[in-house]
Amino acid sequence: MQPSASPGLPLPKYCSVATTVKAPDLHGAVPPWDMSFTCPFATQAPWLATHCTFTRCTACCPCLHTVDRPWPGLRWLGRVGAAGGSWVLARKEPDGFYYLAQIKAAPELEKRGALVVEFEAPLVTGLELPAQQQRVVFPEDVIQFSPSVPHSLQLGDKVLAPWEPGQQRYGPGTVLVGLKKQKGQRASKEKEITVHFWNGKTTKVPLGSVRWVPPTVWKKAVERLQAPHTRDCHSSCLWVPHCSQLGPRAGCTTHRHPLDSSFLCPPCLSCACCQLQCQSSCPLVGPSWWPLTRTSELTTRKLPEPEVKPTAQLLPLQGPKEEPVAELSYNMFSSSSSSSEEENSESHLEMGLPLRQMVSRAVNTDPILSETTSLQQYSPHKPEWRYWRRNGPEPPPGKPGR
């Protein structure tokens, strides 16, 4: 086992006991937002450096790579810390739809590339509708919502709009009847516009509930709703920020689960990230290393010991083609003694049974049975009448040995 690169840090793949980093006192303050859908270590590290930023895997993996580059901030929300109170449409897991929410002040998280939003309480309670709660989301999952300044919509624009009677969930759609006057048409004076949604429904939506989005945002929203594996990944899961003292980590594997997935939140198990790289990037995830016993058990199951099966019967050597069969029979009845003892034993066998057996010294094999003797009378076990002794001649049958 090699020594650890830094004192107090566990060795990758081998250590089963790690050192837990004690969190500094933050005046007993507890984050007010709900981190139930995030990885548990995200709530254990609010004191990390503010230049550590959260980023999401481009392949929609739930575990997030961490980078040590400065976050540019939310341009449409102004400077960092001034986003509190703004109304937005935030995408909420696990359904992937957008809901009306309000941004809460959290400057520390904004500097790292995340936002705290509070979803509006639904007018009609139901199992599918979200309750009023606070969540941590990413800027790319937030759409500006300004009821007083509607966007001038026209035919073919990509929007987010509610299609249900309750108007709680917002989905991607395309405007069929816009507000601007086209060639040969009059300007629409209606308070509703017609939107064709991604699920094939066409509905008239109030103008104040429709929000224009860029085509890239619209395309990403459609892909998340249409691809089942994307919805199951729960890509809004936050991960521990990168520790700058250990150097950057990169790469992500999604081909199998790690040996111990207790360090991930339950929704992330279907698309778990590489445990070795995630744990080696931050000392806070030390207690989740898998023990040595589980690794050894897995290795034992993968590499079973081969079983040696003896041959059913001795086969006679009829020619040069059957030399491997004769050699195999000889190896089963011979021991690991020296070559000189084997030669003495063969000479004694020749002297003891000159009439019933013949020895082929050229190929160094077991005695050859005569043609008149049936092979079915013999077995790979030792005959009862044979006197097995290596340091003396074998007596004839019926006479005791010396």
UniProtKB/Swiss-Prot annotation:
InterPro entries: DUF4537. It comes from the Eukaryota. Pfam families: DUF4537. Residues 332-402 are annotated as: Disordered. Residues 370-379 have a biased composition (Polar residues). Residues 393-402 have a biased composition (Pro residues). This is Uncharacterized protein C11orf16 homolog. It comes from Mus musculus.
